Amino acid sequence: MSICVNFNEVTMHNSKLLLFTLVLIYWTQPLLADPRAGWGLGFGGGSLEPINASSGTSYHTSSVYGGTLDYQWPLGKSFSALITYAEHVGKGELPNNTKYKSYKTTLLGAELRAWMGSFFVGVHGGQYYLAWVESLSSYSGIVSAGGNGYGLGFETKSGWMFSAYHEQSSTFTSSEFPDQKVEGNRLVLGYRWP
């Protein structure tokens, strides 16, 4: 058994994380926000797609639509934390396996947000799930992998919110399909109840 590590990817990922952390530290000095606590529900779409982990080939053939449910609580006036559940569906085709025409991705995770007025910048991580769907009663086994993402957005005092996220999962391995990842962007429009 051998273990391969691509140090270029690890170094690039760590440098992005370090840069993002430094920007957050700089921005948190003048933050005056008071994030809302409560449940949030959002709907949206984007380009969140399964791709071949080796070649980068995309398997999706349509836009992706979905929803998000979260609970947010303030961590002082400058930060908030969320527990989030997001689910998205789209059409797609796998090579050498034509019975599946759609896929479903799910994220169950936690997010930390830094606030400046009504605007926020957030980072999150969690467990990503992927299933290929033939019909409502027939789908592939559900595979899972860790992953992370980042986003930005705003929430109004009346509760309306808009956010944009970039997502990237680790590799899903399955005996049915080639190794895959879920990557892409998603936009969310929603409402948070006090």
Language model regions located:
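Residues that define the transmembrane beta-barrel architecture of outer-membrane proteins
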Residues: A37, Y59-G67, V89, S102-L108, ...
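Outer-membrane beta-barrel translocator domains and adjoining extracellular loop/strand segments
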Residues: E49-Y59, G92-K101, A131-S144, F172-Q180
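Membrane-proximal helix-loop-helix units in multi-pass membrane proteins
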Residues: F120-L136
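Short glycine/proline- and aromatic-enriched beta-strand/turn motifs that initiate or cap beta-hairpins
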Residues: L31-K91, P95, Q127-Y129, G184-P194
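Predominantly the C-terminal beta-signal and adjacent terminal strand-loop region
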Residues: K91, S144-P194
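Repeated loop/turn-to-beta-strand initiation elements of outer-membrane beta-barrel proteins
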Residues: W39, K77-I83, S118-V121, S158-A164
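Outer-membrane beta-barrel proteins
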Residues: Q29, T68-K77, G109, R113-S118, ...
